[in-house]
Amino acid sequence: MVLVFFIVNLLRIDLYDVVKEIKKGRDTMKTIIKRSILDYLKNPVLWIGLIIIVASMYQCLSSYLQIHYIKQNEQITQNDVALEDADVMDGYIPTSDDKERRREWEDTIKETLMDTSKNGFGFSRQEADHVMKEIQNMDVKTASEFLESQYGYYNAIYAYEDLEIHKGTAEEINHYIERKLSEHSFSWYFAKKFTDFAGLHMAFFATVLLSFLFIQDTRKSTYELLHTKPVTAIQYICGKVISGFISMLGVLVILNVIFFMLCLKTSLESGFPVTPIDFCVNSLIYIVPNLLMICCVYTIIALIFKNPLPAAPILFLHIIYSNMLTMKNDIYYMRPFSIMVRFPGRFFETHVAKMSNINQIILVISSVILVCISVTIWKRRRVH
């Protein structure tokens, strides 16, 4: 907050005056907000985009809605998926026994060493046993490096990673689901996956739709006329930001309602616990600040270039940047100023990337700063 007040003071904008001006020009702001929101509602891009988002997100999330306890004599689903994408609805669960996982990994290494095909090494049983004795007291990483340097056995570490999950029996799957649901409700996990995909879709959608926020106002004749009207910079800028923000919130609320109802349906059918607040909390923390930031970026770009369109490629590149999480010691970290929060991991193992909460606070502060700068730009270009 100290940084915010420093920037505001630097720009010679008194926050008290900002609040006072907003209260004073409340009717003017309401007019701007209503007009902008009506323009959005009349825009077919909003409705077409909403339909596309719902369909795309359903395709991404529908598999999680198939999760259920395996009934007696029920055949476990045999979905054709890559092992790295396999999850509990495909019949795969994490391998919890490290000793068993290590034993299976060593068996895989030994089989490959003794394989006489072009993919194997053609070792005899005695030679393979000798190699296994050499690595038996090493950890997996060290053993993999040893196999690569001494025998040219590359990527042994990936064979161990593939054993992170295994095809579970009905009893194992049910026990795993029951254990996870004793920690959190089904909606707690589903809401995180929903937020993951909703954040991605909303970032792209907001980048496209918000380009219309200033598109009419930045036409030369309209732009010059606006600067001669008795509307203050604070009233205009805040009115436009709020209208764009409310429009995006409306779309987000619709998505929350649709997918909460789907989550509730699955929970009732499968006997899973559900908590309605999970969707609201995740959306509020991990999506709302991103939408606010996108609105503010469009605002300042539109004022600098007198055209909002240059913001679109900038934001698309920013989305790509935000999607590229960094990893350190097997832990995912958010990139600074990301406008999208990801939740890596399988359904019941999902977790928010580290530094996400701090990043969201930074986005809110940055949004306030961008609004203050935008107000200053508007004032300096005003025709008296």
Name each region found by the language model.
Residues 18-19, 60-112, 116, 177-186, ...:
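Terminal transmembrane helical anchor/hairpin motif
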Residues 83-157:
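N-terminal accessory alpha/beta regions
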Residues 210-229:
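Transmembrane helix boundary and interhelical loop/hinge segments in multi-pass membrane proteins
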Residues 232-233:
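Short coil/turn motifs that cap or connect alpha-helices
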Residues 52-101, 145, 154-208, 213, ...:
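Secretory targeting signals
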Residues 25-53, 383:
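Aromatic- and glycine-rich beta-strand/loop motifs that create alpha-glucan
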Residues 39, 216, 264, 303, ...:
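Transmembrane helix-loop junction
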Residues 5-28:
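Short, Lys/Arg-enriched N-terminal segments with co-localized hydrophobic residues
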